[in-house]
Amino acid sequence: MADSTSMDHDGEQRGTKRKRDAGAGGSGAGIGKGTSNYVKEGYGPNMSEMVPRNIMNKGNHTVYHVVKQQKYLDFNYVSNQNPYIIPYQTAGFWASMWDQTDIGSNNTINIMKALNNVSVGVTWIKGEITFEVYAVTRQRLLTGTTNQTTWDFETSQNMFIADADREPENFNLATAAATGPLAQQTTQTLLFNANNDRYTKYELPQRNQYTREYDFQQLTNNYMWKPTDISAAANFRRLIPMAEGVYTTTAATTKMAELTEQKSVYAGSGKTTEASLFRNRTSYPRMHMAQPQVPDETGYMKFRYQVRMSTKLHLVFHLYPDYSTSTNIEYMGRQVLELPEVTATGGVVTCMPYEIKT
């Protein structure tokens, strides 16, 4: 005989229990059964589910948002064959800070700004950079001349991506323009020297997409990053979630300092929050876009690459509770950390190719 408690019927047979589901309809609706973890609200048949709005639990009351941008770039190696630096370590790189003219028309950036205003904190999930080479041209001397040049399409020529993943490197961060992919070229001319093993090179063929993903460091114990308009030029010194190593130029015993500074004191906290207490030290190698250094009659071959670059920045915004007031916002802010920031003087981003666990 079948188990009466597992039979799916409405009680036609005497001695069996009527099944009560939490769905709509019937006198058993909304009794509190079901598989959800939501809080029940209401009375009797009108009882409905309500999402708990507990600001101490980051899993609730959140909005997932992706900041997207797409640019067409001209990597020009005619006058300078040195590699370009892709400054993805800067927060402004992910929100077109280096191209202020296009920010206003980018709705994903505008949504990010709006969410910043209603959020107590932000969790950075990951970033994606996709490159696609759609045209390559080469400048060369016109046949039979010594000063007349022409341009040829090089359909078989590829571009190169190189990571400085065997030694620390750095780049300057003096202005908002320095957060752009066309702002800085390196001084190292030997990236493709046969004896150079400091860099790992990847070849990027034409009409192929190359995507790089960066998983950002996750804070623990409900700590969050402070909502910041990373498209504003005033915040150009801000970096993605990280901790950096420091060049020790004085002595081997010089302290390794965090580049994260917590400058604002929240009411009731009594002292500033030391961000280094909650994070391991991690960083990212310096990234370059380069051409092959092949000599010709004018020195090195002079290529120009037309590249489509698209980025995606995955963020989770932790919204204020429904009934937050100006007096308790500061209290909630005790678990919010400032994004890392380079100093105003010097302005050097140190790119560490390895992690330092503490």
From Swiss-Prot:
Signal peptide: none annotated. GO terms for biological process: clathrin-dependent endocytosis of virus by host cell; symbiont entry into host cell via permeabilization of host membrane; virion attachment to host cell. It comes from the Viruses. Residues 23-33 have a biased composition (Gly residues). Residues 1-15 have a biased composition (Basic and acidic residues). It is found in: Virion. Its main location: virion. Residues 1-37 are annotated as: Disordered. Keywords: Capsid protein, Clathrin-mediated endocytosis of virus by host, Host-virus interaction, T=1 icosahedral capsid protein, Viral attachment to host cell, Viral penetration into host cytoplasm, Viral penetration via permeabilization of host membrane, Virion, Virus endocytosis by host, Virus entry into host cell. The keyword Endoplasmic reticulum does not apply. GO terms for cellular component: T=1 icosahedral viral capsid. Capsid protein self-assembles to form an icosahedral capsid with a T=1 symmetry, about 22 nm in diameter, and consisting of 60 copies of size variants of the capsid proteins, which differ in the N-terminushe capsid encapsulates the genomic ssDNA. Capsid proteins are responsible for the attachment to host cell receptors. This attachment induces virion internalization predominantly through clathrin-dependent endocytosis. This is Capsid protein VP1/VP2. It comes from Aedes densonucleosis virus (strain GKV 002 002).
